[in-house]
């Protein structure tokens, strides 16, 4: 029986009421080396199989007086642990304790200055123990308390919000009307730091401790002879998951990378060199580029491209796994025939997947999964077809934690800091039919763009950068001749969470250099344009 994560780490429970900022609360606590977990606000305390050290109630787009407003389980307030309500969370605390919440004619959106009110009582002053005077915070509310509950006192106020923060007179229950989880609240991290102290949490959630405990957990799950399969893309998540699995069970982990013909320049060879030769991972690279490209021929619809790539991937992966299983059976038979049963390995029972915590958050968020904008490429279909059990060693981690874990595992910095790359690869960055010629054009242009970003020392300042091949042609003049060639669009996004993003403001000299190189070196391209769209309204990828 594997040890539950809550028995290994002191944990804070975050109840999500549908706020766009809920995931940030989780991140802020993790950054303080405290494990925390987000669950929907409908979670009943009595149904938890673990006891949190503290509970945080998130904000919400609802009003507490709405008939359909989400309600917190009243047992939260009798669980005997500290509680912190944020925005709607404060209002929910007040609503449950006899306070009054009303719509306000002076709504607060944006920056505000809160004045801390000290009482000279340790537990009342604990949340703002290091704050003095007025502090800039971020407000985003149309409702506010018009009457505080009798058992609460004001611990912060603004000119328009007399109950900007409150504390229970005798219990460790606190509420703040502002959003300490966003960076616009200048001392928000200090507030969470104080709440962690109030909860008396051990601050031992680090990637150093995670490695040892996760390796132990993997070994308990897989057993001494079990074998694990893993589909590797060469991205950060799958590479870190593969290296962690290799550390846990060695060559009983079999990684398979499928070259689908729409990878970046020399990607398959580079990943093999790094994972197999440098890090010792048992990796097989399957060149199925012809198979993928033949099925993608004349296909323009992005969803159809995704489906073709997903289905073809499963077919190729299953065929390779059949070979590995046959090899394993032959090795087992040979070991038994030689009278060496201890050398026989077990069957393939598990499939490694690099699920991250944001994927988990999306699935359990109170407002439910967002409307599907794009079909995500994953290996879920393999589980049904191959009857494998899923093993997800990274499912508790955010992206920055995965990168930190990768560095500790010895993965080179240039790989753990790599920009995200979509599962369908360049097929969804070619806005038209996918042919080998189109792939080569985009590979070359993208390679120039990324090389110049690295040479300028900008790569780590940008969250994601790539080139897109547009389905249009433009008139140009090259070598005194009229040309009618293709157009490349450059995209670079800056973001902290990939939920919102801004375009990266390159210097004009940089853009000129990249444009000149692409139009001079990439045959068939005579024009380069820059995408300056933010997310929203645009997504980071074009398709």
Swiss-Prot record:
It catalyses: XMP + L-glutamine + ATP + H2O = GMP + L-glutamate + AMP + diphosphate + 2 H(+). One of its GO terms (cellular component) is cytosol. PROSITE patterns: GATASE_TYPE_1, GMPS_ATP_PPASE. It is an enzyme of class 6 (ligase). GO terms for molecular function: ATP binding; GMP synthase (glutamine-hydrolyzing) activity; GMP synthase activity. Gene3D superfamilies: 3.30.300.10, 3.40.50.880, HUPs. SUPFAM superfamilies: Adenine nucleotide alpha hydrolases-like, Class I glutamine amidotransferase-like, GMP synthetase C-terminal dimerisation domain. GO terms for biological process: GMP biosynthetic process. Its cofactor is Mg(2+). Pathway: Purine metabolism; GMP biosynthesis; GMP from XMP (L-Gln route): step 1/1. ATP binds at residues 233-239. XMP binds at residues 306, 480, 535, 541. Transmembrane segments: none annotated. Its main location: cytoplasm. Residues 205-418 form the GMPS ATP-PPase domain. The active site is at 87 (nucleophile), 179, 181. Residues 11-205 form the Glutamine amidotransferase type-1 domain. Pfam families: GATase (PF00117), GMP_synt_C (PF00958), NAD_synthase (PF02540). It is found in: Cytoplasm, Cytosol. NCBIfam families: guaA_Cterm, guaA_Nterm, PRK00074.1. This is GMP synthase [glutamine-hydrolyzing]. It comes from Mycosarcoma maydis (Corn smut fungus). The gene is GUA1.
